[in-house]
UniProtKB/Swiss-Prot annotation:
It catalyses: tRNA(Tyr) + L-tyrosine + ATP = L-tyrosyl-tRNA(Tyr) + AMP + diphosphate + H(+). It is an enzyme of class 6 (ligase). It is found in: Cytoplasm. Homodimer. GO terms for molecular function: ATP binding; RNA binding; tyrosine-tRNA ligase activity. This is Tyrosine--tRNA ligase. ATP binds at K240. L-tyrosine binds at Y40, Y177, Q181. GO terms for cellular component: cytosol. A motif ('KMSKS' region) lies at residues 237-241. Belongs to the class-I aminoacyl-tRNA synthetase family. TyrS type 1 subfamily. A motif ('HIGH' region) lies at residues 45-54. GO terms for biological process: tyrosyl-tRNA aminoacylation.
Length: 417
């Protein structure tokens, strides 16, 4: 794309690789060059924490605020009750109100690490769409809002079409999600002057619906901007690892494990991830991404430290690096490693290493743990673990032991005092 942006925000989006598509590049850029543009991203409360897959859009909101605009983080207290069908192969399980509220409380912990909330013109707002969705009158909603939507057009969106092409059913409940998200954009424009919705490229159809509805009912010019759906260079979906989701909440994934995820970045992804997930200057990102051989490991440590410091703070990043050095360079058992603490009742007369490997998260099942041992991939206190029938008693746990799966995944096992 040859367009040269006027606004700092659009320049950052283009230069650092955040931009997949925009409904009106020049119109949005012009608006952002003239004043504050309130902008929202919606987050449905499907889990108690956001994960690394959400981090790209969170960084977009951070850059938005840093370049003089107002971020709105919209919690989906209402839309979560319906479930977004975009590019899913099945219907989302429906959550109860208590679970949704608990998930929202967990999700909120992350945003204050990246955004400044308050009452100022560029201070972030945190809202919940249950505020306007829960009280809707269904018949009035159909008459006033539903009449503006063409079913033919909704069926043409790739997010819906791909599901129907696979002959997988799409419930009427899910089909309504697109209308509710469009209504969110209109309400945010009406109440808070919101002029831009951002999201992943899988949200394009939902965003366009919101733009059309806002124009039709409020006669307001609003915009949409999407980010690419990231995969790693080896084709894995961003935000997943062999051990499961990479959660952003520290109580669901320790800062050390989060740091280690970034330290294990594939060589080919380092430069790109530095641009997207850190605030290092572009020239430095390019320099670090071009390193080769053993030097690329220094770039990975810089990446891990920068990303972890943004989320968990500089001290947590430094502690994670120190733990990693102790574990990998000195063979120690760093205190910040993921830790499983067992009571004497849980240990009983002894607990098997297979159970310990599974319960510590180093394997997803007993079968996987046994295979890990059989293939010489497990270690106990840095010594090869070859006996899947080995039992660990309470005396052995008087001091912590370290279990390892491969070279990069470790956990401490401790006895409760």
């Amino acid at each position: 794309m040859t367009y040269q942006p006027k606004s700092d925000f659009m320049r950052v989006m283009m230069e650092r690789g955040f931009l997949a598509d925009c409904t009106d590049y020049q119109g949005l850029d012009e608006a952002m060059s003239k004043g504050v543009v309130p902008t929202y991203i919606g987050y449905d409360a499907t889990a108690a924490s956001l994960h690394v897959g959400h981090l790209l859009n969170i960084m977009m909101l951070r850059w938005l605020q840093k370049t003089g605009h107002k971020p709105i983080t919209l919690m989906g207290g209402g839309t979560t009750k319906v479930g977004d069908p975009s590019f899913r192969s099945d219907e989302r399980p429906l959550l109860g109100a208590e679970q949704i509220d608990a998930n929202i409380a967990g999700m909120k912990q992350v945003f204050s690490s990246y955004l400044t909330y308050g009452d100022g013109p560029t201070d972030a707002l945190m809202l919940n769409n249950a505020e306007w969705l829960d009280g809707l009158n269904y018949l009035e909603f159909l008459r006033d809002v539903g009449r503006h939507f063409s079913v033919n057009r909704m069926l043409s969106f790739e997010s819906v079409k791909s599901r129907l092409d696979r002959e997988q059913s799409l419930s009427f409940l899910e089909f309504n999600y697109m209308i509710l998200q469009a209504y969110d954009f209109m309400e945010l424009n009406r109440r808070y002057g919101c002029r831009l919705q951002m999201g992943g490229s899988d949200q394009w159809g939902n965003i366009v619906n919101g733009i059309d509805l806002t124009r039709r009912i409020l006669d307001q010019e609003v915009y949409g901007l999407t980010s690419p759906l990231l995969t790693t260079s080896d084709g894995r979906k961003m935000g997943k690892s062999q051990g499961g989701a990479i959660w952003l909440n520290g109580d669901m994934l320790s800062p050390y494990e989060f740091w280690q995820f970034w330290r294990n970045t594939t060589d080919a992804d380092v430069g790109r991830f530095l641009k997207l997930y850190t605030e290092l200057p572009l020239e430095e990102c390019d320099r670090l991404g071009a390193l080769a051989g053993s030097e690329i490991n220094d770039a990975k440590i810089i990446l891990a430290n920068a990303v972890t410091a943004l989320l968990h703070g500089p001290e947590a990043a430094q502690a994670a690096e120190a733990t990693a050095r102790e574990v990998f360079e000195k063979g120690g058992a760093g205190e910040d490693l993921p830790t499983l603490t067992l009571t004497t009742d849980e240990i009983g007369d002894g607990i098997s290493v297979v159970q310990l490997i599974t319960r510590s998260g180093l394997a997803k099942s007993g079968k996987e743990a046994k295979r890990l041992i059989a293939e010489n991939g497990a270690k106990l206190d840095d010594a090869p673990l070859t006996d899947a029938g080995l039992m660990i008693d309470a005396d052995r746990l008087a001091a912590p032991i370290k279990l390892s799966a491969g070279r990069k995944r470790h956990a401490l096992i401790k006895r409760a005092d």
